[in-house]
């Protein structure tokens, strides 16, 4: 500030005065030089003196101008710096004023609001009462809890047909069914094993019959005696019987048990009927009233003699009596018709009513069991099919030859866990078995195509939506002749050809015993 004041008050005004003085001096010097040149005799000397004065005058004027210009520029720089300082101060003052205005505005806005009561507490608060730790209790693992979840192996049920009609016909062709039949009950195991109540009957070798023995179909009408070595009740063996089977149907032999079967096919609905335990002594028949029974300790006692021929009136009675006895749960056999009485003092004895006989002997209705249905036409015409199936049980004219003793128990090899061994009087138990027609063990029906891709069984009910489709129930047998890329199959069922969704059926699986 002092420097600027000195410049403004001393140096700059001094420089200006020096310039004015130089101006006056230059005029006097010019007059002197002019007069000297005119008056001097030595013109050359006067000229040189004039040149010297001129040079000195120019130099002094230039110095004075330079000094004054420097002082002015220095004054301008000082003033510019002062202006910048003043500008900064003004900006600071303006910002301070703005801040003050903001504070005042916020204060005015805060007046219009209400106070909020905030409680100053910790974010995490420890519970007042600590929970007591729960003692660990080990629970046994339930391996069957997930058996009904997921897409596991679909086991085909052989002797059970669902009575609920799940109409899946409205589903799109590419979408699998969203419902499936209820899962079968588990019998104490994690998965369906070989001892499941729905599995196929175990293959059992048929009893051996002597060559000189001729089966008698009317022996079912004779008194019988239970073998003394029998220790297992018939009810202890899981057996399933079909009401649609005929007396000439195939027996569940090793061929029928080698298939994985489910449902009843298109033959009929199978009905599970438990085999009742035979009573120790049957009521005395009308034809042998007053006759004492045979002793129970005689395992090889001779059979009671029966007439060689049966009256013709017994055939319709036996055929007509089959249905009510079946419905009654096998209450008791029909009283036998005999012409000779058993020996005195012996109890009734049980014998097998099913014997493997000659394959060329035609079956007769009169010799059927009292609780069996009369043989159907298909069972009589499918005699040749029995060559590939189990032992054929036929009814022949009566014979007086006594039956052989029960065969010795033969071992049956099976996978683990093995089934319980059959009792020694197994063929006596076979006498109470109702024959059924196995749609999987028999040969293909007449309406089956000569060549087909595979044989499938329906696992859901389906109602057709179009004319070229098939409608079927669960358990129906279909022969697939073509598989389309869109998931639909073309097959034959009961002689009718049509389309059906491939996800509603499943191939009949085979397994080796």
From Swiss-Prot:
Signal peptide: none annotated. The modification Phosphoserine is found at residues 40, 183, 227, 368. Widely expressed. Abundant in testes, ovary, thymus, and colon, with lower but detectable levels in prostate, peripheral blood leukocytes, and spleen. The keyword Aminoacyl-tRNA synthetase does not apply. Phosphorylated by ABL1. Residues 174-185, 273-282, 400-409 have a biased composition (Pro residues). Residues 217-241, 376-399 have a biased composition (Polar residues). GO terms for biological process: actin polymerization or depolymerization; cell migration; cell projection morphogenesis; cytoskeleton organization; lens fiber cell morphogenesis; mitophagy; neuron migration; peptidyl-tyrosine phosphorylation. Residues 242-272, 283-325 have a biased composition (Low complexity). Residues 45-107 form the t-SNARE coiled-coil homology domain. The modification Phosphothreonine is found at residue 361. Transmembrane segments: none annotated. Residues 167-431 are annotated as: Disordered. GO terms for molecular function: cytoskeletal anchor activity; identical protein binding; kinase binding; proline-rich region binding; SH3 domain binding; signaling adaptor activity; ubiquitin protein ligase binding. Component of the WAVE complex composed of ABI2, CYFIP1 or CYFIP2, BRK1, NCKAP1 and WASF1/WAVE1. Within the complex, a heterodimer containing NCKAP1 and CYFIP1 interacts with a heterotrimer formed by WAVE1, ABI2 and BRK1. CYFIP2 binds to activated RAC1 which causes the complex to dissociate, releasing activated WASF1. Interacts (via SH3 domain) with ABL1 and ABL2. (Microbial infection) Interacts with human cytomegalovirus UL135. Belongs to the ABI family. Regulator of actin cytoskeleton dynamics underlying cell motility and adhesion. Functions as a component of the WAVE complex, which activates actin nucleating machinery Arp2/3 to drive lamellipodia formation. Acts as a regulator and substrate of nonreceptor tyrosine kinases ABL1 and ABL2 involved in processes linked to cell growth and differentiation. Positively regulates ABL1-mediated phosphorylation of ENAH, which is required for proper polymerization of nucleated actin filaments at the leading edge. Contributes to the regulation of actin assembly at the tips of neuron projections. This is Abl interactor 2.
């Amino acid at each position: 500030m002092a420097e600027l004041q000195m410049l403004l008050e001393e140096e700059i005004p001094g420089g200006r005065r020096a310039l004015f003085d130089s101006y006056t001096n230059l005029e006097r010097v010019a007059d002197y030089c002019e007069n000297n040149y005119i008056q001097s005799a030595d013109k050359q000397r006067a000229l040189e003196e004039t040149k010297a004065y001129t040079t000195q005058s120019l130099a002094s004027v230039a110095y004075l101008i330079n000094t004054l210009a420097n002082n002015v520029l220095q004054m301008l720089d000082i003033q510019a710096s002062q202006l910048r300082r003043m500008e900064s101060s003004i900006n600071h003052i303006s910002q301070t004023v703005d801040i003050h205005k903001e504070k005042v505005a916020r204060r005015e806005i805060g007046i219009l609001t209400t106070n909020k009561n905030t409680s100053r507490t910790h974010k995490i608060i420890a519970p007042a009462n600590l929970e007591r730790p729960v003692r660990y209790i080990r629970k046994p693992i339930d391996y069957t809890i997930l058996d009904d979840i997921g897409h596991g192996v679909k086991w085909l049920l052989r002797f059970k047909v669902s009575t609920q009609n799940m109409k899946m016909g409205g589903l799109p062709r590419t979408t699998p069914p969203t419902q499936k039949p209820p899962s079968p009950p588990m019998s104490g195991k994690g998965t369906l094993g070989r001892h499941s109540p729905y599995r196929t009957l175990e293959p059992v070798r048929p009893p051996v019959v002597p060559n000189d023995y001729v089966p008698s179909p009317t022996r079912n009408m004779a008194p019988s005696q239970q073998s003394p070595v029998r220790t297992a009740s018939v009810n202890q063996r899981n057996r399933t019987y079909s009401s649609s089977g005929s007396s000439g149907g195939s027996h569940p032999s090793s061929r029928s048990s080698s298939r994985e079967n489910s449902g009843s096919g298109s033959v009929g609905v199978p009905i599970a009927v438990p085999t009742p335990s035979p009573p120790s002594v049957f009521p005395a028949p009308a034809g042998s009233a007053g006759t004492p029974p045979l002793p129970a300790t005689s395992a090889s006692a001779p059979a009671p003699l029966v007439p060689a021929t049966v009256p013709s009136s017994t055939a319709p009675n036996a055929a007509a009596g089959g249905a009510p006895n079946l419905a009654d749960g096998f209450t008791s056999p029909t009283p036998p018709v005999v012409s000779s009485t058993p020996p005195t003092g012996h109890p009734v004895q049980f014998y097998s009513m099913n014997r493997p006989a000659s394959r060329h002997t035609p079956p007769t209705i009169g010799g059927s069991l009292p609780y069996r249905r009369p043989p159907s036409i298909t069972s009589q015409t499918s005699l040749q099919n029995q060559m590939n199936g189990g032992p054929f049980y036929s009814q022949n004219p009566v014979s007086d030859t006594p039956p052989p003793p029960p065969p010795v128990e033969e071992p049956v090899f099976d996978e683990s866990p093995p089934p319980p061994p059959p009792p020694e009087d197994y063929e006596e138990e076979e006498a109470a078995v109702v024959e059924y027609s196995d749609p999987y063990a028999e040969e293909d029906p007449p309406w089956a195509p000569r060549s087909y891709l595979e044989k499938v069984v329906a696992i859901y009910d389906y109602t057709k939506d179009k004319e070229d489709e098939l409608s079927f129930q669960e358990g129906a047998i279909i022969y697939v002749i073509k598989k389309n890329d869109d998931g639909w199959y073309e097959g034959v069922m009961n002689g009718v050809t049509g389309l059906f969704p491939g996800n509603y059926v499943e191939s009949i699986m085979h397994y080796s015993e």
